[in-house]
């Protein structure tokens, strides 16, 4: 490519809260993107600002084909090209520039010495051994601190311990990254020898470093390697470079949406010798990216500035050795509780003791520090690649939430009273409004904290069963069991729930709920596509649910929003996004619900809006706005505002699950009990081993079915077209209940 490329782009400014036209010059040799208010100012050398490209990260968004971001030096710069083609030209040029200036030429290549894989393994084992020695020595600090009588001396020891813990954490990361780098070199390469570094998803655009680089037209330049490593993957495309592992330092990302003010811009041009360019030699490159008005040109508030010295020792759950089953090393065991699963497995006689209550826990650890969140996510970044489906990844055990995805779906019914009251309304208009109310209340209970953790990927054939007692009916003196229902030991006044993992590839979960006395049921299936998106993690929920109100023969078809884990390297938080619908074909009532993601240039988190329509009406009779995990307000056709839902004041009803010893071996809590227990006591090695046993058993069963040419037979659900339907729904068991 040419040594210099120039052209117009629009740049987002915080002062003007909009896009402004700028003339950009990309200097390949200097690794610098400079910008000017006009081409004339560029010719006079009046530079407005610049972006250093060494160690930079490029971000793109598949929902907007003209914008992109560059994150470097703890700043995020937002740009907008004229169209997708122009953005591709800039990104391609920026990619090659970043590649060149992010590389570190291996020392010793000129001498002809080429280390072998055996040399690498030996050094890696030595590093791990020294790490274990250091970890053992750290334990002596606690004894020293306790025995120290002098406050000043104790403070010095505590500071020394903090510094040592910080160093241990860095060493752990280094060992993990070295192992990942080794594994990456063994991966199968594309037939043409090229690996693309672009994957147009809601993600970052991240170039990859070269294992060995030869750029015939450009002199090479050594550069320090940045702190963290991420591996990217995409579709093959023409390139002159063989691409391998990547080095980057990530920040948070939000997608810009304003319309470009740079319409009619000319395409970027490039030239080797154009006299109009202001050439910059490497020694004129500034130490940091800057603008003439710093906070005018980047979103500084997007980044959390952490302390330079973390004030905590790395938890065992963050141990680098738990990243893969083949990793070596040791983890720190720090039991923080004496509680065990055995406490919920005692054989009691009263009703309260017949069920397992270990769901009354704070899995998400809201009190954990931001640094701990960052450390967890850094391990994830080290293992996965851009655009990779996380359901296909053997995740490090410590990043898992202590429950199965099937159990998480049960939280849709944390307000069972709202669900069963749908059929109590006589007017179809009110029934639709009640369906929307239950739907909007169904999401906040599933997310109690901000830590980016992932439920267990359910095993094929895994089942989860539970039920809820309706408020006010908890002490039913004469409960009548539903022997033919999904939960035979539940009463007719209970809301019962059952879920099954009906497919492993693709991962599809089906679940069903009913209340016999209220004559209502719900059937749904969700195919989860969990993708690593660089700056965030996205979960696309593909599928639908159906609320069936048997007394009126009404069926409400609904869809589910996508989920995103944002700002995963700073203060992680979860948001929902996407447009969902609820339709009743019989009555014609319908609703549109939009979960709004937070834009980078402002706005609130967790916003949701909804509009409910009567049949054939284009104007909604009810508009809803608020936060899906807070308060939502309804505005009727007369303009009156009322509180629609207040999730802060609505108590959730605890689900009831059978004791572990009463469960079948394929039920979720029993199947995952060893993993759950060891995660709870922070024994990550034991949890990893238990998880590995489950995965190996699943693989062995799959091989056996393949050898015997047998198909998997589901337990409770069957496929009906593109849907998965419960075998014995209430509508089928009680035909007399039909309208």
Swiss-Prot record:
Sequence segments annotated as region (Disordered): 220-292, 306-371
Family: Belongs to the OSBP family.
Composition bias type Low complexity, residue spans: 260-276
Gene Ontology terms describing biological process: lipid transport
Protein name from the UniProt record: Oxysterol-binding protein-related protein 9
Organism name: Xenopus tropicalis
Pfam families on file: Oxysterol_BP (PF01237), PH (PF00169)
Function as written in the Swiss-Prot or TrEMBL entry: Interacts with OSBPL11 to function as lipid transfer proteins. Together they form a heterodimer that localizes at the ER-trans-Golgi membrane contact sites, and exchanges phosphatidylserine (1,2-diacyl-sn-glycero-3-phospho-L-serine, PS) for phosphatidylinositol-4-phosphate (1,2-diacyl-sn-glycero-3-phospho-(1D-myo-inositol 4-phosphate), PI(4)P) between the two organelles, a step that is critical for sphingomyelin synthesis in the Golgi complex.
